[in-house]
Each structure stands twice: as structure tokens, then as C-alpha cells.
Amino acid sequence: MQLAKPNSLTIEDFHEVSPGFCTRIHVQMRRYVYRIAVARSQEIYEAMRTEPSTVCFSERDYAWFLPPGLDLYKMQKACELFHGTHVVGSFFLHRDRDKRKEQRRGEYVKAIRYIEHCGVSKGEAYAFDNDLYDYYNVSVYSRSFVREQIRRMMGAIIAHGYDRIPLSLIKWLLANPISDNFWGLRLRVAPPYGLHLVDVSYDPVDFVNPNPYVDNKVIVVGEDGTMKERLEKNLDAEKEERELDENDEEDGDGDELLENDRRIVGSSQR
């Protein structure tokens, strides 16, 4: 990354951790932000396709461009429906090949997720200020997500913001957690380039006393000075790690839920 874009990566802090600590399994909270750019007029929105401005190029990989008319109040009402614990099967890209794999193993992915917070806030331009678009952030806090969950949530939230679907339809999707229901209603999955992982939080106790203890790969130096890689299997941790791998998507949201009363939420959206 530093070669492609110098000075784009900095180390702000580091911690010494136990050999049994896992950066994925021991996560307490993840904070994702989905950025949207709403055109201030229909002319500006249509010109994006025929005569794109410098703003369009600067935001191309960082926000979802939308036409004017988005109702923020309705968006917020849709966001609030996701608070709490839900079976989010309707917002889960559950592919047939994954279902067959689960059937062979006799292990099935859980789609129960706890959403700490989902809400809309004022955003800002990525590169430079302009008078063409209004920027907004949809922030979602949870320990873990299923594949495509946030992008499907955003598709439903935006659809209600444009008054294309009623709130009752989102409630129905939450009450009828089947993956095919989302496509059956012809809802659009939000594009991936607006989604950003902003913060990952851990309980400092897990740095030194991780629970569960994960047997990571360890480099052992022998008496003759040779180095060997050792991996001792922890079956419970290995099973959970496998479930995490099978539910990851390109943006990294797909970890198995572990109920824990200690929830550490990252700093508020800047």
C-alpha cells in the first residue's frame, strides 16, 4: 500500500499480546460507515454520467452517488428498526454452494446479530469541499455481520428514504429471515465502494488473557538455531475461525457472533 500511495498508512499504537490472542475472534465491536453523496439538483446528478466533474472522480471509489429528494428523517426511522438483536437472514447473501457445504458438515451458519447502533449523520467531502453534493454517513456498530448485511441494509434504508418502500416492508424482512426474500422484493444491494471499516475495538483484558485461547502459529527456535513453525490445534477456536472465513466478504464483515456483556464501542464519528 505504501508503494502505491506513499504516506497513506500510519501506525498510531501497538500492544504486546498473548500468543493465544486473535485479531478476529476477540473483536468486541466493529464500526462501519457507509458514505452517500446526494446531488443538490437533478441536473447535477445527470451531468455525472455525461460530463463528470473533478468531484465525481475524487469520490468515485468512496461514496454512493444518489439523486436529490432523499428524506433523512425517513432514513433515520428505517435505521432505528435494526437496533437490537435480529435474525438477519433476509440481509444475508447465503449462496447455494455455502448451503451445500454446511449440509455436508452438519454445521449451519447462525444469522443472529446484535446491532448496537445504526444511524444517519452529516458527512463531508472526501477530497475537497464543493457545492454540488450533500454528504451523509450511515454508521453501524456491531461485533459481527453476515455477508452483504450492511449493503443490503443500506439498500432498504435508501429505498425507504426515497419513499419506494414502507417501513412495514423492512419489518417484514426482519420477521421473515430468508435470504431470497430480499431479491424477491427487487431491492437493490448498495454498491461496495461506499462502505468503510472505520474502527475495530477490543477488550484490553483479552490482550493478556484471551478467551477463548487460540493456538496461533508460533516460531520456535531450536538448540541448533534453526527456526520451525508450530501450530497446536484448539478445536473450538479452529471451528470458529473456519466459520469466520466462510462468511467474510470483500469488506470484511462476516464474523460469528459471541454474546458478551462487555461491549467496547469505538470513538464517535468524526
Spans of features found by a protein language model:
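Structured-RNA-binding interfaces characteristic of tRNA pseudouridine synthases
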Residues: 1-270
